[in-house]
Amino acid sequence: MATSNLLKNKGSLQFEDKWDFMRPIVLKLLRQESVTKQQWFDLFSDVHAVCLWDDKGPAKIHQALKEDILEFIKQAQARVLSHQDDTALLKAYIVEWRKFFTQCDILPKPFCQLEITLMGKQGSNKKSNVEDSIVRKLMLDTWNESIFSNIKNRLQDSAMKLVHAERLGEAFDSQLVIGVRESYVNLCSNPEDKLQIYRDNFEKAYLDSTERFYRTQAPSYLQQNGVQNYMKYADAKLKEEEKRALRYLETRRECNSVEALMECCVNALVTSFKETILAECQGMIKRNETEKLHLMFSLMDKVPNGIEPMLKDLEEHIISAGLADMVAAAETITTDSEKYVEQLLTLFNRFSKLVKEAFQDDPRFLTARDKAYKAVVNDATIFKLELPLKQKGVGLKTQPESKCPELLANYCDMLLRKTPLSKKLTSEEIEAKLKEVLLVLKYVQNKDVFMRYHKAHLTRRLILDISADSEIEENMVEWLREVGMPADYVNKLARMFQDIKVSEDLNQAFKEMHKNNKLALPADSVNIKILNAGAWSRSSEKVFVSLPTELEDLIPEVEEFYKKNHSGRKLHWHHLMSNGIITFKNEVGQYDLEVTTFQLAVLFAWNQRPREKISFENLKLATELPDAELRRTLWSLVAFPKLKRQVLLYEPQVNSPKDFTEGTLFSVNQEFSLIKNAKVQKRGKINLIGRLQLTTERMREEENEGIVQLRILRTRKLYIQIMKMRKKISNAQLQTELVEILKNMFLPQKKMIKEQIEWLIEHKYIRRDESDINTFIYMA
């Protein structure tokens, strides 16, 4: 019965029956007139009914809609074209377009069933999307064909004129330009590229007009106002154009209009004047004009390869200014390691501040700073260190190196040793200054030289017990580890501290054992240091000296005590590294003298004959010291800089220890005394060890030669390791890998690299490739 009624009503559900009810509502919607809820729902219902019951209904609805939409648009077209003036036409168009475009989102909604029917089953599974609506497409296509395609050039030109006027400071309604853009964006019928019409027309016109504007404006502004004012102008215009582009150009994700516009502006405002702007860079750096440099940096960073010339200028400035300052202060800093380090740190802080303020610590400029500062630190023109190298009995010299690592080690020693400098600083201040040294050390190429000198100073501090702060001493070892010093070196330093602690326990045990025994010297007055040869690595050279009887008799006692606790180990006595305190008595007073073993041996020659004059020749026989060591020791007793009255007198007078002859006579100064504030002190203590090295002249030469030999061995060893792993490698790649591994210790010289390659070939570790002499092959 229900089916029969539906079939009876089917006749009343035809298009012809319903359109007369539907059309008034459609026209109201097109004209943006109010529609009641009932009318709105009726339209949905009627469209649904016609699409279901009238086979030709959907096509008829589509055609009828098209006709009504076209008619509505023709009326709008007439209103727009009634204006002859381009600006008036643009305003009229935008008014009509805004109303129509709003309805493009509303009118399609009641026609959902039409969409489903016309698109078939496939479409029925898709989510309803107004933007993809057939009705919406019909509305936009009709608008495009009837109005927009005919006047789009006039609209576009008007819009560009408005933008041009805005650039010149004139005000207008920005919605006029935005409306034209929206028309271009929304009226494209190409489903594959909905922005094609917009890109080909509006975007292109916008970019072209922008470029034309600045190609005209920029050169004249530069000519009239100069580079520095022009940079401000260019920066302001780039920011202004970016804001304008965000208003007037399409900003959706798939569109890169703003980026294209900014590239266009950069080309017109910056790239075209790149050389002219960059020509000012060097002068700005010299004058420390950080604000102007920052502005130049922000502009040049937008230009391909714009930063490279600035980096080059910065590097050149740091090197030239840095070396100029070092040369200007050379007289002071070459003799004062504290002043030298302070000068380097002042330079580093100055250049770092420049990079921070001008370039915002940009990594590229930090790298340039590091590269240039490294060149200053490692420059050898002012401070040369020549390392000797003996080959087949012939003394050679390597290429001069910077003395920086040696001076850094000396400064560390001043901070870590009991000195006037360390005494006036707190522990925190000493720590801060050591951290500053480590900062500079990062830039030192030949860190192995620093290591050698630092270890020599540490040896001296530990043996003489003159460290200012033992905790900071041990912390320094860990800091060196943290900054990437080789582990084998740092481990040896740590072992040195262990030896000192073990020696303290041994001393305590020795004193306990002999507290009731009578020794040549009281046990309490003896301090023994047993050092591991591997960690302390002293020279193999033994310097013989004839010891006073008291010391000579003590040695067997110590050896016997040590063997009881450590069987199988042999002690080698290094008198060169020993020191002690002796009491000097004369008619003036009594004084304690801190002396080396060599000084002690010389002074004890007068114990039985205090008022006699002894010749250089007889002192050599009495002490059995080598000639060079005796001369050095005697000079420290006759010309000690801190004493107004020397311990020994001599005749005839000479200018240096080298001028002593076999007949030079020495005697004890019976009027020796310590003078303080112009007053003679009857008692006191003086350290005569001073800066006497705990090494002989020959041992110092060996130390320096050892640096070179160790470099050769490390280079050779690494070459073999690399070749073993690579099997076959080019000369360039081999050298690159070698330098990369060794850079934390030293920078191998080209001559050394070449010599070691030849050595490896000669000893059949590697061979040259027959087809390419610059390629090496590993030989097992």
From Swiss-Prot:
InterPro entries: Cullin, Cullin_CS, Cullin_homology, Cullin_homology_sf, Cullin_N, Cullin_neddylation_domain, Cullin_repeat-like_dom_sf, WH-like_DNA-bd_sf. GO terms for biological process: protein ubiquitination; reelin-mediated signaling pathway; regulation of neuron migration; ubiquitin-dependent protein catabolic process. The modification Phosphoserine is found at S34. Neddylated; which enhances the ubiquitination activity of ECS complexes and prevents binding of the inhibitor CAND1. Deneddylated via its interaction with the COP9 signalosome (CSN). The modification Phosphothreonine is found at T210. There is a cross-link at K724 (Glycyl lysine isopeptide (Lys-Gly) (interchain with G-Cter in NEDD8)). Residues 713-772 form the Cullin neddylation domain. Core component of multiple cullin-5-RING E3 ubiquitin-protein ligase complexes (ECS complexes, also named CRL5 complexes), which mediate the ubiquitination and subsequent proteasomal degradation of target proteins. Acts a scaffold protein that contributes to catalysis through positioning of the substrate and the ubiquitin-conjugating enzyme. The functional specificity of the E3 ubiquitin-protein ligase complex depends on the variable SOCS box-containing substrate recognition component. Component of multiple cullin-5-RING E3 ubiquitin-protein ligase complexes (ECS complexes, also named CRL5 complexes) formed of CUL5, Elongin BC (ELOB and ELOC), RNF7/RBX2 and a variable SOCS box domain-containing protein as substrate-specific recognition component. CUL5-containing ECS complexes specifically contain RNF7/RBX2, and not RBX1, as catalytic subunit. Component of the ECS(ASB2) complex with the substrate recognition component ASB2. Component of the ECS(ASB6) complex with the substrate recognition component ASB6. This is Cullin-5.
